[in-house]
A protein has these predicted regions:
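Membrane-helix interface motif
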Residues: 29-44, 118-128, 226-230
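Membrane-proximal soluble regions of multi-pass membrane proteins
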Residues: 157-205
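Select subsegments of transmembrane alpha-helices in polytopic membrane proteins
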Residues: 11-18, 73-77, 102-115, 205-213
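Alpha-helical transmembrane segments and their helix-start/interface "positive-inside/aromatic belt" motifs
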Residues: 4-21, 62
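Alpha-helical transmembrane segments
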Residues: 17-20, 52-75, 136-151
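Membrane-water interface of transmembrane alpha-helices
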Residues: 32, 70-90, 152-167
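Active-site and channel-lining beta-strand-loop segments
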Residues: 28-60, 188-190, 196-200
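Juxtamembrane boundary at the C-terminal end of a transmembrane helix
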Residues: 219-233
């Protein structure tokens, strides 16, 4: 038995993500000494600063922390998606292929936003150095481009996942009519009752872990980043 093998695109994307994070961290550490000891963090309507914070490694490396949070969180989701154990005779099973496609999509989304944070690192250094508000029009264009690319990845994944064939209905495997729960089924992804899309098998603990991790992204992640920003005010 083995887990789902990641696609070539997934493996390449993971390497690129690691390289982007290392380059971002190196750039910020090289520029650290040249930054003002008081970093402008709040600006007036005319673009001049009226609020500062002390320069610290944690503040300067904030884009890298965001990159790491994205990489570790989305990477964790990808690993959970690939955790479906299967035999050597099942590599083409529909749910195995669906897991590989979903993990690829998650990894590509991580790459998009990790790369965006690399530009954010450069924009922050520029803002701190010039002491003028704003990240420039390029920031907005790249942010919009990231959103468009994320949507394109999601659409691509949707077509790759396809429409699974519905399974024979077994009443004890379905809770509240739509929630699939079958601990004896090794699949993480299973067809919905009508076969129109995929759903999770909540009989597997990894499904609960997957939902918990996704919730943590939206709750814990922003809290930690906000704490770093407000530290020392």
């Amino acid at each position: 038995m083995r887990g789902v093998r990641p696609t070539l695109v997934t493996r390449v994307a993971v390497r690129v993500i690691a390289a982007v994070i290392l380059v971002s961290a190196g750039f910020l550490m090289v520029r650290y000494a040249s930054l003002p000891w008081l970093l402008p963090v709040h600006f007036q309507a005319n673009g001049f600063p009226n609020g500062w914070q002390y320069r610290t490694p944690a503040r300067v490396l904030l884009p890298v922390f965001v990159q790491l949070a994205l990489a570790l969180t989305l990477g964790g989701i990808g690993m959970l998606l690939l955790s479906r154990m299967h035999g050597a005779d099942e590599p083409e099973a529909p749910d195995v292929k669906a897991a590989a496609a979903a993990a690829e999509a998650v990894t590509l989304m991580a790459l998009i936003w990790v790369a965006f944070q690399a530009y954010a690192a450069w924009a922050l250094v520029s803002m701190w150095t010039t002491e003028r508000a704003g990240f420039g029009l390029s920031y907005s264009y790249l942010e919009l481009s990231g959103a468009v690319l994320t949507g394109a990845v999601a659409v691509r994944a949707h077509f790759r996942l396809g429409h699974p064939a519905p399974r024979p209905f077994v009443a004890e495997h379905w809770r509240y009519g739509q929630l699939y729960k079958n601990a004896s089924d090794p699949a993480l992804f299973v067809p919905t009752r009508d076969g129109r899309r995929w759903t999770l098998n909540f009989g597997r603990p990894v499904a609960a872990a997957l939902l918990g991790l996704i919730l943590a992204v939206g709750i814990v992640g922003p809290t930690i980043i906000l704490a770093i920003l407000l530290r020392g005010r």
